[in-house]
Amino acid sequence: MKVTLIAILTCAAALVLHTTAAEELEAESQLMEVGMPDTELAAVDEERLFECSVSCEIEKEGNKDCKKKKCKGGWKCKFNMCVKV
């Protein structure tokens, strides 16, 4: 009886650990798919990030408040970066 109970509990624990690991792996793979844009899109994103941060830095150096450059196409300037809205 004890052996059967131990075997059942061991199998249940292994199943829980396996399921949890599988869910984490699936979530990570979905994040990787979503977070990996095409190279063309990445270049556009980097360009927008660069334009926005340079604009803010120039204005800060002139002892003015940073009036963030308006980002177009569903983007906005936040923390000196263009972010997707």
UniProtKB/Swiss-Prot annotation:
GO terms for cellular component: extracellular region; host cell postsynaptic membrane. InterPro entries: Hwtx-2-like. Expressed by the venom gland. It holds the Pfam family Toxin_20. Disulfide bonds join C52-C66, C56-C77, C71-C82. Its main location: secreted. PROSITE patterns: HWTX_2. GO terms for molecular function: toxin activity. Keywords: Disulfide bond, Neurotoxin, Postsynaptic neurotoxin, Secreted, Signal, Toxin. Residues 1-22 form the signal peptide. Residues 23-48 form a propeptide. It comes from the Eukaryota. It is found in: Secreted. Monomer. Neurotoxin active on both insects and mammals. Belongs to the neurotoxin 12 (Hwtx-2) family. 02 (Hwtx-2) subfamily. This is U4-theraphotoxin-Hhn1a.
